[in-house]
Amino acid sequence: VGYFIGLLLSIGSVMLGESEGLVNDLMGIGIYGLLSIVLLNLSLIINDKIILSKFDIKKEIFDDKNVGTGVVEGSNAIATGLVVMGAITGEGYGEAGPIVNVLIYWILGQIILFVTSKIYNLITSYDIHDYIERGNIAVAVGYSGAIIAIGNLINNSLAHDFDSWMITFQDVGFNVIVGFAFLPIARLLTD
């Protein structure tokens, strides 16, 4: 379900602006839809190999029926869908072109989601990977909330008209720093 939500967010973002005619709109949906599918799948591979590398996600989901791992996998797809949505939504792009902008934003988003994962694990009194592997759904939901929240902050930072890379990185940096500052506060309030 998370994968399809991420896909809807990213592909649906093509239709948020004004119409450029039926043919151009369909071409945009096709190009960005294909790009979204590729980026979502790459994100899941990154999630498997880098972010949650302490256990085998496919084994946890398919063999062990670990709901918590499925929740985390879905939240990664939703967060990535939000990042791609923000990247596609804004008008204008740098000299490199719109596809390169989306790719740079996606890479930036993946780095931030990785850092979020590390910070979240540091601010908890337990190893989230261990508890997720053991099937603790509450830990998975808490972690997923953080990942999706940061993905939403990235989305809001990117979903504006492109002025310059400096302004974009400042917007993303400010929002992410605020998000990182609130992560421990949210953990404290919910615990």
Q: Predicted regions span which residues?
A:
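Membrane-interface segments at loop-to-transmembrane junctions
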Residues: 1-2, 57-73, 128-143
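Transmembrane helix-loop junctions in multi-pass membrane proteins
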Residues: 11-24, 83-97, 122-128, 152-170
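Membrane-interface helix-loop-helix junctions at boundaries between adjacent transmembrane segments
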Residues: 20-39, 43-73, 89, 95-100
